[in-house]
């Protein structure tokens, strides 16, 4: 007859085994047996049998020993189990929440609605990277005709760091940067696959809890609040039930309409935050970069300008990896490049290596473009840095009260939030241009080794390493009325 039980204790030559029916047995000890191991044995292996009915005292001792072993094993398992580093919500129309560790590996997949439960039953995504997990989810959604691969529907992804929002905490900043890297990698992976477009939002643990209490995914909840910022009538139930692709595209359309006064004459600009006082224009300090590059950038001639005649165009260097635009604008006279940046004035910023391309906002994302329409999308009011008045912040002319800031290392435009983190993300130091000291570069306040640069025409904050990086991170400041 076969028996199965757990090893409770080892003696010199025997092992005490407890079975599920609370019987305790002594069997011969073998080299492979250890405390806590589940073993099978036969009557031939039993040295002495002690029934709980015959020896009540021994049965109690076995039971206590069993409980102690279970508790010890539970403690070991809990110590081994990795901590949830962050929560990633994915909305296609099925909605999921993925728990990840600090390496970006999946710990758990939680379906948030009935459609997600159907798909989740078909998936095996334990112990793989979150990028691969979401790719598997997208493939399953394509098979189920939830995503139209030919039209590249949007999917909504939110990231929530599993830590209280302590902006001044070094641990918070370190873990936030680690999560940003994971999310950037995830976004690049999805977009390179060509299966879908990605719209990414960030949330904190309080927003996640608020979303859970209202029975909505974190991503949809953040999107709902973005809609409220745009003064658009959207109920929470609509945000919960709407097709996520339609929801994102509608929000982007509303944002685009509100940015163009001609198309949306009823637009009312959001008031500038009360903390920002009107300043008499004064020269802003121009500190040196915190991390000086190891090699001095090759000197390039500064752009020639004329105060009384049309400006002379400067040939655009051809970048080695950034796509060369097929159409270059005809140079036109522009205001004189600013030697110094002063608070309170409006400015445009022209790329040093893509002449005629200006920093602008499109669908609340920062990028460089020629022929900006409306031109106000490329104009920014220079105000004292929200986190440090010796630095600067960029306030949108189209949207007063909205500022350029970095999020997941992308440069975006966002409505002012009264938090230290927002103020730091929206603050930049003006430093001599990486490619030409007569021009300017913008150093992130809270990531001092990263600078605003364009890549594939979109704006990021990144570390500057190559000659191309230096050129992409250098701009010409131009005063405008």
Swiss-Prot record:
Q: Where are the transmembrane segments?
A: 51-71
Question: How does the protein's chain sit in the membrane according to the entry?
Answer: Single-pass membrane protein
Locate the compositionally biased regions of type Pro residues. 316-336
Q: One matching Pfam family, short form? A: RsgI_N
Q: Per the UniProt entry, what is one GO biological process? A: L-arabinose metabolic process
- Is Membrane tagged as a keyword? yes
User: What does the function comment of this entry state?
Assistant: Anti-sigma factor for SigI5. Negatively regulates SigI5 activity through direct interaction. Binding of the polysaccharide substrate to the extracellular C-terminal sensing domain of RsgI5 may induce a conformational change in its N-terminal cytoplasmic region, leading to the release and activation of SigI5.
Task: Tell me which species this is from.
Answer: Acetivibrio thermocellus (strain ATCC 27405 / DSM 1237 / JCM 9322 / NBRC 103400 / NCIMB 10682 / NRRL B-4536 / VPI 7372)
Subcellular location field: Cell membrane
Q: What keywords tag this UniProt record?
A: Cell membrane, Membrane, Transmembrane, Transmembrane helix
Q: What is the official name of this protein in its record?
A: Anti-sigma-I factor RsgI5
For the Cytoplasmic compartment, the record's topological domain ranges are 1-50
User: Which residues are exposed on the Extracellular face of the membrane?
Assistant: 72-481
Q: Where is this region: Disordered?
A: 255-339
């Amino acid at each position: 007859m076969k028996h199965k039980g757990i090893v409770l204790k080892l003696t010199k030559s025997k092992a005490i085994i407890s079975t599920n029916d609370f019987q305790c047995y002594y069997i011969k000890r073998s080299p492979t047996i250890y405390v806590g191991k589940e073993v099978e044995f036969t009557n031939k292996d039993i040295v002495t049998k002690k029934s709980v009915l015959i020896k009540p005292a021994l049965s109690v001792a076995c039971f206590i020993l069993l409980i102690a072993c279970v508790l010890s094993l539970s403690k070991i398992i809990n110590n081994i189990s990795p901590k949830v580093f962050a929560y990633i919500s994915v909305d296609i129309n099925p909605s999921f929440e993925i728990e990840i560790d600090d390496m970006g590996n999946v710990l758990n997949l939680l379906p948030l609605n009935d459609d997600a439960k159907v798909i989740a039953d078909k998936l095996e995504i334990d112990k793989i990277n979150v990028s691969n997990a979401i790719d598997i989810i997208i493939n399953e959604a394509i098979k189920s005709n939830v995503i139209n691969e030919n039209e590249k529907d949007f999917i909504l992804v939110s990231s929530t760091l599993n830590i209280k929002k302590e902006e001044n905490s070094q641990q918070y900043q370190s873990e936030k940067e680690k999560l940003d890297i994971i999310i950037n990698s995830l976004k690049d992976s999805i977009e390179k696959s060509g299966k879908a477009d990605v719209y990414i939002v960030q949330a904190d643990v309080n927003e996640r809890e608020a979303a859970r209490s209202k029975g909505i995914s974190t991503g949809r909840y953040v999107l709902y609040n973005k809609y409220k910022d745009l003064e658009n009538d959207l109920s929470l139930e609509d945000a919960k039930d709407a097709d996520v692709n339609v929801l994102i595209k509608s929000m982007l359309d509303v944002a685009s309409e509100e940015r163009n006064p001609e198309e949306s004459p009823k637009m009312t600009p959001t008031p500038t935050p009360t903390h920002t006082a009107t300043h008499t224009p004064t020269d802003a300090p121009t500190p040196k970069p915190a991390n000086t590059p190891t090699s001095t950038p090759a000197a390039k001639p500064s752009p020639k300008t004329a105060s009384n005649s049309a400006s002379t165009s400067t040939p655009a260097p051809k970048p080695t990896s950034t796509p060369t635009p097929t159409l270059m604008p005809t140079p036109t006279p522009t205001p004189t490049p600013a030697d110094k940046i002063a608070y309170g004035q409006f400015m445009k910023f022209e790329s040093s290596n893509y002449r005629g391309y200006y920093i602008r906002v499109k669908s609340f994302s920062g990028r460089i473009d020629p022929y900006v329409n409306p031109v106000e999308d490329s104009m920014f009011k220079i105000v004292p840095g929200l986190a440090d008045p010796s630095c600067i912040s960029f306030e949108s002319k189209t949207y007063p009260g909205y500022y350029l800031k970095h999020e997941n290392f992308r440069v975006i435009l966002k409505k002012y939030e009264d938090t230290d983190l927002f103020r730091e993300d929206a603050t930049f130091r003006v430093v001599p241009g990486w490619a030409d000291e007569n021009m300017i570069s913008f150093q992130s306040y809270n990531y001092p080794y990263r600078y605003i640069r364009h890549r594939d025409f979109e704006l990021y904050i990144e570390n500057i390493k190559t000659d191309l990086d230096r050129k992409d991170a250098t701009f010409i400041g131009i005063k405008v009325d």
